[in-house]
Each structure stands twice: as C-alpha cells, then as structure tokens.
Amino acid sequence: MEKAKVILRKASAISALKKADRELAAGIAVAYTHAGGAVVGAVVLACETDFVAKNEDFKALAYGIAMHVAAMNPQFKSRLEVQDSDLVAARAVFEAEAANVNEANRAKAIEGKIESYLRERVLLEQPFIKDPTQSIGEMINSAVQKFGEKVELVRYERLSV
C-alpha cells in the first residue's frame, strides 16, 4: 500500500510539472475563521477554468489550506522565499546544538535539523493538519492530476488578534 502511495505522489508531481506553464484565469479566495474569531487564515487558489473553480472539491481544498494556515502559521510559501540570512542564523543555532555530537554524525544532524526547520516553516512542505501523510504541496499536485489543469496557491495570509 505504501509503494502505491509513493507511485501516486510521483505521478501527481509529474502531472503538475507538465501543466506548469499554463495560464491561470480563474480561482477562488477563501477564508477560515477559527472559533472565537481570534485567528483567520485566507488563501487565493488559482486554476485555469471557472469550471474547476466552482467544483466543491476545489473549494474544499482551498478551505482546508486556509484552515491549515490559521493553525500552523507558515512563514514562507516555498523554499524560494526563505532568505539566506534565515538559513545562516538557523545553521548557527543547530551547529551550536550539535557541538557535542561526534564529528562523523555532526553534518548529518545539522542537515536534518535544517530540513526539519524548513518543513515547519514552509507552507508547501508542511504536513496537512487533517492528513499528516501528505504535504500541502502534495495536495495541490494531487488536485492538478484530479482536475487535469494547473492549480496554484497564489497567496496566503494569517491574521490574529
């Protein structure tokens, strides 16, 4: 079963890559307000056609991502947005933490911590709060495969009191 999931994820990524240069002409903006109204997550999810934008599964995807944004407070959409200065500062902290680790394992430990640091802060790499077996990026790639057209998270915002 796990092997099948891996194959499906690879197929979704390939499908998304093939559609990457298509124009996005439709989409939706969705907001999720957490109980009490103190936290709001909002997203703009774009697609190629109005037909897909009106689809209930597409709307549910956007709402789920908005809920995730409210809950997890991602700092970056993708790794491309992470500043070098942030990585340098994180690496310095992790190197200090790994000072007592033996030389052979130190580099591997630091790289593992950096990967974890990025996974916690980059929205497209975060495990979805309602289904931690897939990331937000994998969910979007699955939507590309399901709908047969390009789907892209254009913008997200988290507001809190």
Identify the function of each model-found stretch.
Residues 1-161:
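N-terminal assembly/interaction segments in proteins that build large macromolecular machines
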